[in-house]
């Protein structure tokens, strides 16, 4: 009974490794390319990619629209 349980656990672990290996290799390759790109000058880039989305000032039209929306 113990042997069957051990075989079952080993089989489950092996199946999990097979099914997750694609994600593991993708993560490792992605991490490697990220590290390599950060080492060179070309890896330095502007990380403020969401500055165009956020606008701190609201115009009068925006305020009117929000007031109409919240009524």
From Swiss-Prot:
Q: Where is the signal peptide?
A: 1-23
Asked if the keyword Signal belongs to this entry, the reply reads: yes
One GO location term (cellular component) = membrane
At the top level of its lineage, which domain of life is listed?
Eukaryota
List UniProt keywords, sorted A-Z: Amidation, Antibiotic, Antimicrobial, Cleavage on pair of basic residues, Cytolysis, Fungicide, Membrane, Secreted, Signal, Target cell membrane, Target membrane
Q: Which GO terms describe its biological process?
A: defense response to bacterium; defense response to fungus; killing of cells of another organism
**Tissues expressing this chain:** Expressed by the venom gland.
Q: Does the keyword Nucleus apply?
A: no
Q: What is its main location?
A: secreted
Location of this chain's protein in the cell: Secreted; Target cell membrane
Give residues where Leucine amide occurs. Answer: 39
Coiled coil spans: none
Propeptide residue span(s): 40-71
Function, as annotated, reads: Antimicrobial peptide with potent activity against bacteria S.aureus (MIC=9.3 uM), weak activity against E.coli (MIC>100 uM), and weak activity against pathogenic yeasts C.albicans (MIC=100 uM) and C.glabrata (MIC=100 uM). Is not very effective against P.aeruginosa (MIC>300 uM). Also provokes high hemolysis on human erythrocytes (HC(50)=4.8 uM).
What family classification does the UniProt entry report for this protein? Belongs to the non-disulfide-bridged peptide (NDBP) superfamily. Short antimicrobial peptide (group 4) family.
Q: Indicate what this protein is called per its UniProt record.
A: Antimicrobial peptide VpCT4
């Amino acid at each position: 009974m113990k042997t069957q349980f051990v075989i079952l656990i080993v089989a489950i672990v092996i199946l999990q490794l097979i099914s997750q290996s694609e994600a593991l290799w993708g993560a490792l390759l992605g991490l490697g390319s990220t590290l390599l790109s950060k080492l060179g000058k070309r890896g330095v880039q502007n990380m403020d990619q969401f500055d165009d989305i956020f606008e701190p000032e609201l115009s009068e039209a925006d305020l009117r629209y929000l007031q109409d929306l919240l009524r």
